Every structure is written in C-alpha cells, then in structure tokens.
C-alpha cells in the first residue's frame, strides 16, 4: 500500500472517529434525560424496609397531615411547551428518638382525583429515617396541579415531620430542579 493511500485512510478513519465522538457528545445528554419507565404498582414497604421499624404498641395520641404540591408537568414558553418532571416525595422523621407512623401517602391529579395510594397499611418510620415515593418523568397522570396528602401519627409529643417534593426534568440542554415544601393541613375558619 502506498504512503499516500495510507495517509488518506488514516485521515478518513480519524474523521469518522471525530464524527462518532461528536455524535456521542450530542446524544449522551439526551439519553441521560430520557424519561424513566413507568413502573407497575410499587411496594413502598419493601423498597423502604431499611427505614421502617415495628408499629408502636401504644395508642397513637398525636396526628397530623401534610398537603404537598407536586408538578409532574409544567407549562413553558407562554403555554406552548409542556415539560415533564420526575417527582420524588420524601417524608422525613425529624425525631431523634421516636418512631413516626405514616398512615397514608396518596397522589392526586389537577382535578383532585386520587391517582395512586402508596400504602396498604400504616408503617412506622425509624427516628431520623426517610421514606420516598418516586413518580417517573413519563407518568404525567398528575398534570400541572398534582399533589400528595401525607397523614402521620405518633404515640406522643414528636418533632414535626419534614415533607418535601423534589421535581427534576429538562428540555434540550436546559435542566431544572425545584422543591415544593409540604404544608400542614389544618382546619381554618370560625370557631
């Protein structure tokens, strides 16, 4: 093989390698932000087994609830573009000493219709432990006004739980992440 042919072949191979590297550089971010596959019914008790403890035997004397706004979809560009987000709901037991009983974790859509209930029965969360629920990016059943209701209880005085939803998503090269804090549910009005 002549030196000129070898040089052309090497140049062509180098050009092809640069093209493949450029193509990989363009496609890799797309693969990283592709939506997660929607899962079937998730057994939260099994997934969070390390965070759970035995249910308290004493009466549950204290209880409360949280309303947590969640945004599985957000309208952008004057409503012309919808960006879908994954949602991770985290329920943190802020007590260092007591178990926190989670009675209900329910997911509702924009119209207020229950989409999913995540507990078969109440579970007890270890001190300082966390339980999470993940809504994949391609699960848009909640819409732009989705929310969670989390009901909890304890045997006595306890640090109020911390409940938040983390939304993560993106479009093209723009990525977004934001947190929505749970708000305690209370009856408001005249006494």
Stretches with model-predicted labels:
Residues 21-31:
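Bacterial N-terminal signal peptides
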Residues 91-98:
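Asparagine-centered strand-capping/turn motif at beta-strand->loop junctions
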Residues 81-88, 146:
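Short, solvent-exposed loop/turn segments enriched in Ser/Thr/Gly
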Residues 32-38:
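Sec/Tat signal peptide C-region and signal peptidase I cleavage site
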Residues 98-105, 116-118, 160-162:
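Short, hydrophobic/aromatic beta-strand segments
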Residues 41-44, 139-191:
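Terminal connector regions
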